A protein has these predicted regions:
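Small-aliphatic-rich amphipathic alpha-helix that forms the alpha element of a beta-alpha
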Residues: 1-17, 38-48, 122-125, 146
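Short loop/turn motifs at secondary-structure junctions
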Residues: 11-13, 94, 131
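Glycine-rich anion-binding loops of enzyme active sites
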Residues: 16-103
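Glycine- and acidic
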Residues: 17-29, 108, 128-133, 173
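Glycine-/charge-enriched secondary-structure boundary and capping motifs
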Residues: 31, 35-49, 54, 58-71, ...
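A general structural motif
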Residues: 76-82, 113-120, 159-164
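A glycine- and small/hydrophobic-rich beta-loop-beta segment
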Residues: 92, 100-103, 108-135
Length: 176
C-alpha cells in the first residue's frame, strides 16, 4: 500500500491504512492462527512506519460448504496529495528513461524498513521536482509486469538491460 501511494506522487508519511480481511470460518487453532498472524504482521509494519490504521472490514465467514476462500489480508493506503503532484504509471513519451528504485528484503525475508523509508523519500522528492513523470509499484509480477503495464498505456515499447532470472521476482516495495 505504501509503495503504491508513493508511486502515485504522495508521501507515505501521512498515509493511513485500511484493511480488508478474507479468511475461512474459524473452527480450530490453525484457522484462528491465520488472521492472527496476518494482523500481527500488519501491526508490526504500522509500528515500524509509524502509521495508523483507520479501520477495515473483515470477511471471516469465507466458507461455503467445503470450499474456503484463500486467506488474505489486503492493505489500502489513504492520504491526501496536491493534485498537481499526482503521476500515473504509463510511459508518457518516447525516450523516457526507466530506473528501478529497488527494495532488498532482509535475510529473514522481512522488509528493510530503513531502506524503504529512504527509497520512498527519494522517489517522492524526485516526483515533486518533476524528474519522475511515471511510477509503478512492483508487485507479484515483478519488473516484467511493471514494464508491460507501463508501456501498454501509450503503446510505447521499452528496452531494458536486466538479469532475466530476476524479471519475475516479486519486488515488493520497489518502484519503477
Amino acid at each position: 500500500a505504501c509503495s503504491k501511494v508513493v508511486a502515485a506522487g504522495a508521501s507515505y508519511e501521512k498515509m493511513r491504512f485500511s484493511y480488508q480481511e478474507y479468511f475461512e470460518r474459524m473452527t480450530d487453532r490453525k484457522s484462528w492462527g491465520k488472521p492472527l498472524s496476518a494482523l500481527l504482521g500488519a501491526l508490526k509494519m504500522q509500528v515500524e512506519f509509524g502509521l495508523p490504521s483507520i479501520g477495515g472490514k473483515d470477511s471471516m465467514s469465507g466458507t461455503f460448504e467445503n470450499i474456503n476462500v484463500p486467506p488474505m489480508l489486503m492493505a489500502f493506503g489513504i492520504t491526501t496529495v496536491d493534485a498537481g503532484q499526482v503521476i500515473s504509471p504509463e510511459l508518457k513519451y518516447e525516450g523516457n528513461k526507466l530506473y528501478l528504485i529497488k527494495h532488498t528484503p532482509l535475510e529473514n525475508h522481512m522488509p528493510d524498513v530503513g531502506q524503504l523509508k529512504a527509497n520512498w523519500k527519494y522517489v517522492h522528492e524526485q516526483i515533486q521536482a518533476e524528474n519522475i513523470v511515471s511510477g509503478y509499484a512492483l508487485g507479484f509480477g515483478g519488473l516484467a509486469e511493471a514494464i508491460c503495464k507501463m508501456s501498454f498505456g501509450n503503446g510505447l515499447d521499452a528496452r531494458i538491460t536486466y538479469d532475466e532470472k530476476e524479471l519475475f521476482n516479486y519486488g515488493y516495495g520497489s518502484i519503477l
